[in-house]
Amino acid sequence: MGCGNSTATSAAAGRGKPGAVKDATEDSITEDDKRRNYGGVYVGLPSEAVNIASSQAKTVQKS
């Protein structure tokens, strides 16, 4: 409710085999959530940020 996913899930569930559609929908939502932009606020980490964080963590561990 109040989520962008609720509309897509409701529309997909109304067609074909509910079990098969549900599995495919859950997988795609999971992937979308990793890259979703909620009202101008980016949710998730871009690959550059992940690389920076991992390099900083290595530096902290060495010192």
From Swiss-Prot:
Belongs to the OCC1 family. It comes from the Eukaryota. Residues 1-10 have a biased composition (Polar residues). Residues 1-37 are annotated as: Disordered. Signal peptide: none annotated. Disulfide bonds: none annotated. This is Overexpressed in colon carcinoma 1 protein homolog. Coiled coil: none annotated.
